[in-house]
């Protein structure tokens, strides 16, 4: 961990992202780019949160990477992985029962976005207790995934 509470991997990712946004190569980015940069690093600040950061931190002119690191250490709040998983499962759990149908999950994970191969899904679903009704309790699955 670095002195500001960020891991070396985080600092490295932040440096890479910062350099991408430093389009003129002067080692600085504009305060107006802070939001998109934070989002590219896994944060999800609202516009009002960004305005508050810009005001509180007195960001009236372009700032350098060290200042950016300081800002990230103070203000970057990434969504925990378990919350991301839970939110994704809740989309499938329209009645709010805590369960999702394996068939629905299979369809989505093998046909949308970064598709799993059906064989990959079959391996993945072995990690979960599937009920006789063909559904899984997603909190159990999330607990297993987070523990790995």
UniProtKB/Swiss-Prot annotation:
Binding sites annotated in the UniProt record for Ca(2+): 22, 24, 26, 28, 33
InterPro entries: CALM/Myosin/TropC-like, EF-hand-dom_pair, EF_Hand_1_Ca_BS, EF_hand_dom
Domain called EF-hand: residue spans: 9-44, 80-115, 116-148
Entry superkingdom: Eukaryota
CDD domains, A to Z: EFh
Gene3D superfamilies reported in the protein's UniProt record: EF-hand
Keyword Calcium: yes
GO cellular component terms, semicolon-separated: cytosol; nucleus
Keyword terms of this UniProt record: Calcium, Metal-binding, Repeat
Role of this protein: Potential calcium sensor.
Stated name of the protein: Probable calcium-binding protein CML14
Source organism: Arabidopsis thaliana
């Amino acid at each position: 961990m670095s002195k500001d509470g960020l891991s070396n991997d985080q600092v490295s990712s932040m440096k890479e992202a910062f350099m991408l946004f430093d389009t003129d190569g002067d080692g600085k980015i504009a305060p107006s780019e802070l939001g998109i940069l934070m989002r590219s690093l896994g944060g999800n600040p609202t516009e009002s949160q960004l305005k508050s950061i810009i005001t509180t931190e007195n960001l009236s002119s372009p700032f350098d990477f060290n200042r950016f690191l300081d800002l990230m250490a103070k203000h970057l709040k990434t969504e925990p992985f378990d919350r991301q998983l839970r939110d994704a499962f809740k989309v499938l759990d329209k009645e709010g029962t805590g369960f999702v149908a394996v068939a629905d999950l299979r369809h989505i994970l093998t046909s949308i976005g970064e598709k799993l191969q059906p064989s990959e899904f079959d391996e993945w679903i072995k990690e979960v207790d599937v009920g006789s009704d063909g559904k899984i309790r997603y909190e159990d699955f999330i607990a297993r995934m987070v523990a790995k």
